[in-house]
Amino acid sequence: GVGVNELNEPVSLDVTILHKGEVVNPIAVKSSMYKVCGKCVTVHVDNTNIDIIVSNDHKSYQGQLQFEKAGIQNWKEYDCVVVKQGYIFPELKEGAKFYVMSLTDGPTPQNTAKIPFKLVMRPMYPIDNI
């Protein structure tokens, strides 16, 4: 957090670095060919069962290849995997024991009812109760 508001306050964590890796973007879904887009560090939060991938690029994690490049050999072995993105990619959906789509505010809000539209042809779902 950078302290912009109460939802974005900085926190201190004691961590152990597990791996320094690359952020990659597969050329196609489930492809082994990729482009390197940035760097990442995978850390373990001390005295917990939590590992976190911190990257300097905003690429969506789509599947195993990207986790491997970040030092996570099998993401399917984790009890819970959280990815901050607006879409659940097929490989993640297929490999997950359970998955949830969370509608959060941000630069690409998925909850369209909260978008402050300026020019709307009425009626328009979900803006209007149809």
What are the roles of these predicted feature ranges?
Residues 23-130:
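Extended hydrophobic packing segments that form well-structured cores
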Residues 1-36:
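Glycine-rich, Lys/Arg-enriched anion-binding loops that position phosphate/diphosphate groups
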